[in-house]
Swiss-Prot record:
Binding site for NAD(+): G137, V138, D158, R163, P203, M204, G205, M206, A213, V228, G251
Entries under PANTHER family matching the protein: BIFUNCTIONAL 3-DEHYDROQUINATE DEHYDRATASE_SHIKIMATE DEHYDROGENASE, CHLOROPLASTIC, SHIKIMATE DEHYDROGENASE
Gene coding for it: aroE
SUPFAM superfamilies: Aminoacid dehydrogenase-like, N-terminal domain, NAD(P)-binding Rossmann-fold domains
The protein's assembly and partners: Homodimer.
GO cellular-component term (any): cytosol
UniProt similarity note: Belongs to the shikimate dehydrogenase family.
Molecular function per GO: NAD+ binding; NADP binding; quinate 3-dehydrogenase (NAD+) activity; shikimate 3-dehydrogenase (NAD+) activity; shikimate 3-dehydrogenase (NADP+) activity
HAMAP family: Shikimate_DH_AroE
EC number(s) per entry: 1.1.1.-, 1.1.1.24
Species annotation: Corynebacterium glutamicum (strain ATCC 13032 / DSM 20300 / JCM 1318 / BCRC 11384 / CCUG 27702 / LMG 3730 / NBRC 12168 / NCIMB 10025 / NRRL B-2784 / 534)
Protein's recorded name: Quinate/shikimate dehydrogenase (NAD(+))
Length: 283
């Protein structure tokens, strides 16, 4: 067997993450024993440790890479030796590759993950006008992916309109055109009704946040509907959309493809997407 792979996930509230299992199973299937550790700063072992201390510890211990999640995707940037152009433009990193010399490079596979999910799940979707509900969390990555995968006009709706406009400014600067505008999420249903598609980028639909981020009565069979939530896979939003006959994109595609792209960066190996999907869905 070849050299083993040591990976980790730094963030808060990581107990339900399916990423460790996907990486460990894929590494083993490729003949590389893989250990993927949760490094939870709300947990007993890493509690109270700052991000730099945890990153340094990973370097000293010979980690091959780290995934970074809430609340550290922005804070990690200045601690890295190098950051990809895309991640720099977005101001967010979710994947850190550590080479044999300890050199760290940051990437954002949330963007590529959502983009690949769109290509796979909505290959023929109309993209002239799209609404994204939610500007926090993975919102910047989703917006960037939408605009770079053919969306001509993207309206990002949030209850905090300043946050929505700040996201729009970041994406517009990154892509070099006025593709995104931030809008108020209150009364967004009229805007959605006139759009081609809508993406939920809020936590609404998760067990802790039941319901939908907007009134689904604005949807028709001509809309396509995406959701970043993957627990449950069929959210209330997607259930309502499918009942209308809408094309839909569930949150599993982004979750799986971000891990697929990260595994490739960590190891230099070509992951088997179907196998990683099978692992994800088995959990």
């Amino acid at each position: 067997m070849n050299d083993s792979i040591l990976l980790g996930l730094i963030g808060q509230g990581l107990d339900l993450s399916r990423t460790p299992a996907m990486h460990e199973a894929e590494g083993l299937a490729q003949g590389r024993a893989t250990v993927y550790r949760r490094i939870d700063t709300l947990g007993s072992r890493a509690s109270g440790q700052d991000l730099k201390t945890l990153l340094d510890a990973a370097l000293y211990l010979g980690f091959n890479g780290l995934n970074i999640t809430h609340p550290y995707k922005q804070a990690v940037l200045p601690l890295l030796d190098e950051v990809s152009e895309q991640a720099t433009q977005l101001g967010a990193v979710n994947t850190v590759v550590i080479d044999a010399t300890g050199h760290t490079t940051g990437h954002n596979t949330d963007v590529s993950g959502f983009g690949r999910g769109m290509e796979e799940g909505l290959p023929n979707a109309k993209l002239d006008s799209v609404v994204q509900v939610g500007a926090g969390g993975v919102g910047n990555a989703v917006a960037y992916a939408l605009v770079t995968h053919g969306v001509q006009k993207l309206q990002v709706a949030d209850l905090d309109t300043s946050r929505a406009q700040a996201l729009a400014d970041v994406i517009n600067n990154a892509v070099g055109r006025e593709a995104v505008v931030g809008v108020d999420a209150r009364g967004i249903e009229d805007v959605i009704a006139a759009a081609d598609g809508v993406v939920n980028a809020t936590p609404m639909g998760m067990p802790a946040h039941p319901g939908t981020a907007f009134d689904v009565s604005c949807l028709t069979k001509d809309h396509w509907v995406g959701d970043v939530v993957y627990m449950p896979i069929e959210t209330e939003l997607l259930k309502a959309a499918r009942a209308l006959g809408c094309e839909t994109l569930d949150g599993t595609r982004m979750a799986i493809h971000q891990a697929v792209d990260a595994f490739r960066l960590f190891t230099g190996l070509e992951p088997d997407v179907s196998r990683m999907r099978e692992t994800f869905l088995s959990l």
